[in-house]
C-alpha cells in the first residue's frame, strides 16, 4: 500500500527550494494554481494568517520553515539573534491560534536550538529540523492512511460511500493528507466507491479544495451543500464520516472546521460512524477539554460580500472558523501512533505517553 500511495501522489502545497518557502496559494484554487515565494518570516506569518496555506499540519510545517528564514535574517543583522528570534516565534504563534500543530512545530524548533552544540552551524541545524518536521508529517500521513482503511475494512468489507468535510488532504499537510489520505488508500484498495464532499462554508474548502484534489486523482466525488448533509446520510447509504482535526483536547474533544460538530450530531442520529484522522501532534494534553481550545473567529467581511454584491448593511456577523465536537460523538481517532476508539482522557494519555521500542 505504501508504494501505491507514493506512486499516486499528485498534489503538494509546500516546497522548500533555494532557501525560500514556496506555497501553493489556496485562496485561488481551483481556478488558478499560483505559487507564492516567501523569503522572510513576515511573509510566512502573513501567508498563514491570510490562508494562503491552511490546515493544521501544513501551518506547522510552514512556521518551521519561517523560523529558518527568521534566523537567517537575524544572523545577517548581527546583535543578539537569540533574543531577537523570540519576536519571530511570537509573530508566527499569533498567526492562527487554534492549530495545535503550529505550537508543536514552534516548540520543536525551540528545543532544537536548546540542544545546539558549540561546534554546530545553527542555521544548518534549524533548517534540517524544519525538513525533518516536513518529512515526519508525510510519513505520519502514510501510516494513518493504512490504519484508517484497515479500520473501515474491519467494519464492512465491501466498497462504501464516505462523507468528508473541509479539506484534510495533501493541501492541508506535508504529504497525502489525513482524512483524504484514508480515502485515497480506500479507493486504491477498492474499499471506497464514492466520496461525498460538503462544500464547507464560508471558505468553501470542500468545493474548492477537496473536490479538486479528489477529481485530480480520478476518485469519484460528489459535491453537496452543507445544508444537504443530514439528508445525504439518510438517503445515500453513507457508512463513515471521515474528517481531520486542528486540535484535540486531552479528553478527546476535537476542534475542527466549523460545521463539523453538527455533522457529528447528524452522524450519531443516523447511525453513521464518525472518524477523526489527525497526527498525534494535534493532541494537546495541556487542554483538558474542548472548552479550553482557543477558537478563532475571522473578519465579518468574509460573510458580507456575495459575488460582489454586498449583504444587508450594518448587520452583525458571527464568523467562527472552528467548532468543538465532543468526544462522545466520535467513534474513533486515527493517529500515526495508533487508533483510539471511543476516545477519552485515559486512552489519549496512554497513546501519547506510550514508550516506543524503536
Swiss-Prot record:
Keyword field contains Amino-acid biosynthesis: yes
Top-level taxon in the UniProt lineage: Bacteria
Under catalytic activity, the entry for this protein gives: 5-(methylsulfanyl)-alpha-D-ribose 1-phosphate = 5-(methylsulfanyl)-D-ribulose 1-phosphate
- Is Isomerase among the key words of this record? yes
Cite the GO molecular-function annotations of the record: S-methyl-5-thioribose-1-phosphate isomerase activity
For the ligand (substrate), the binding residues are 54-56, 96, 205, 256-257
Keywords for the protein's UniProt record, in alphabetical order: Amino-acid biosynthesis, Isomerase, Methionine biosynthesis
Q: In which pathway does it act?
A: Amino-acid biosynthesis; L-methionine biosynthesis via salvage pathway; L-methionine from S-methyl-5-thio-alpha-D-ribose 1-phosphate: step 1/6
Q: What is its EC number?
A: 5.3.1.23
Q: Which residues form the signal peptide?
A: none
One annotated GO biological process: L-methionine salvage from methylthioadenosine
Supply the enzyme class, top level: isomerase
Enumerate the InterPro entries for this protein.
Answer: IF-2B-related (IPR000649), IF-M1Pi (IPR005251), IF_2B-like_C (IPR042529), Initiation_fac_2B_a/b/d (IPR011559), M1Pi_N (IPR027363), NagB/RpiA_transferase-like (IPR037171)
Q: Which Gene3D superfamilies does the record match to this protein?
A: translation initiation factor eif-2b, domain 1, Translation initiation factor eif-2b, domain 2
Q: What does this protein do?
A: Catalyzes the interconversion of methylthioribose-1-phosphate (MTR-1-P) into methylthioribulose-1-phosphate (MTRu-1-P).
NCBIfam families, sorted:
eIF-2B_rel (TIGR00524), PRK05720.1 (NF004326), salvage_mtnA (TIGR00512)
Name the family the entry cites. Belongs to the eIF-2B alpha/beta/delta subunits family. MtnA subfamily.
The protein's name is Methylthioribose-1-phosphate isomerase
Q: Which organism is it from?
A: Pseudomonas putida (strain GB-1)
Gene that this sequence comes from: mtnA
